[in-house]
Amino acid sequence: MIVINTINEATMKKTILLLALLLCCSTSLPAQKAKTYIPWKNGKLVVSEEGRYLKHENGVPFFWLGETGWLMPQRLNRDEVSYYLNKCKDAGYNMVQVQVLNGVPSMNIYGQYSMTDGFNFKDINRKGIYGYWDHMDYIIKSAASRGIYIGMVCIWGTPVEQGLMNEKEAVAYGKFLAERYKDEPNIIWMIGGDIRGDNKTEVWDALANSIRSIDKGHLMTFHPRGRTTSATWFNDREWLDFNMFQSGHAQRDYAIYRRLLLNDLQKQPIKPVLDGEPRYENIPIDFKSENGRFDDFDVRMTLYQSMFSGACGYTYGCNEVWQMYSDKYSPMIDAQTTWKESLDLAGACDMIHFRKLCEAIDFFRGRPLQHLIERPEQTDDDYAVAYGGKDYVLFYMPYGHSITVNLSGWTQRKNVRLEWVNPRNGELIFYKNIETSEAFEVVSPTQGRGNDWVLIAR
């Protein structure tokens, strides 16, 4: 007995020593890097059969979660591009919107111009020179290596409005863009650029048709002026795959979605629609500093209200980031902090919680279910929205408070589980189990501005 115990003790000591050595060795090894998700391995982006959402050729849904980096091509160098795109990837974005040209010509941080002979791009690639389009190539390929699409606003609306690109030049420019980028997997074309579609319509049609005649493999939309939608002018165009509206930087309530989003979803032919420029975080409300600034709560409200009302995606924006503001540049629209500091604002950090929620449920088989909210009579500034599928319903309550819900028309199950999701940190909190035979009231854990909540019934 004594011998056996001695052997076991010795063996145990050797085992502990071996485990300790293995642990020491393992901590000295480099950590396994998380594999980058490359969405286009699922095939090209296409419009879903019912015309409401975007998906890949193999059927995998695509949830557009965009970031706004309008002046990245002009203001960031290669190292800064890498830093910015890494932050975008870590924050959960899978798309970044940029202005390919913000002027005619445009100049980038390296002092290189976008064109040297008008819209004749024949000799644009010069040996030994890292030109404007070489830098654009770098941005696109850098984004691709991180699984990020680039939303290419080909030319901003202002120079077109000023007559700096006509129809003939639009055809030449579209041909150049399409031939250069048709084989890149991570391109989404965006015609327009903060402009009404009835302003130089013939130029926008020429640009779109020129690109589409060469590149039939990438989706295309139109980026409109604030508080307008592409559907007003282009919904019947073959080149327009999905609609985009800009709820803009002045509206503060649900009325803008009723006028633009809900109206677009009723148009024929049916096309997906998304808010490509909602309230930017930290931008002065209606561009006037005396009105205060939009904050993380304003951002979350636009995200959840638009997505739960039937949008196919959402683009976040920040006042300092879109312009890549730093002490090298004069601030626009009263920019305050640098673009690098602003990447970590609260609203930007909240985006990934919504993406994880979408990925945890079968979001794109859902639909708006507003009729499930029975009371109270809602005002547009505190408008709760409902969205759900076969196995779940989501309710977004901007100011918390209480709503009366009736699930009897949604499910045959006698009981459902209710949980709260805190959209500020992604925390899931059990609420209660409840019978579905009749309407019931739910009261959020906290109430008031900045105390928005998502209720899940499943």
Residue ranges and their predicted role:
Residues 1-33:
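Bacterial Sec-dependent N-terminal signal peptides
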Residues 27, 146, 214, 268-269, ...:
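Helix C-cap/helix->beta junction micro-motif
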Residues 35-254:
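Active-site mouth of glycoside hydrolases
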Residues 60, 272, 281-283, 297-432, ...:
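Aromatic- and carboxylate-lined catalytic core of secreted/periplasmic carbohydrate-active enzymes
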Residues 190-192, 221-224, 244, 274-277, ...:
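Short beta-strand segments
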Residues 196, 218, 227, 271-274, ...:
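Residue-level detector of flexible, active-site-proximal loop/helix-junction positions
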Residues 237-325:
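Catalytic-core region of carbohydrate-active enzymes that cleave or remodel glycosidic bonds
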Residues 440-441:
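Short strand-edge motifs at loop-to-beta-strand transitions and within beta-strands
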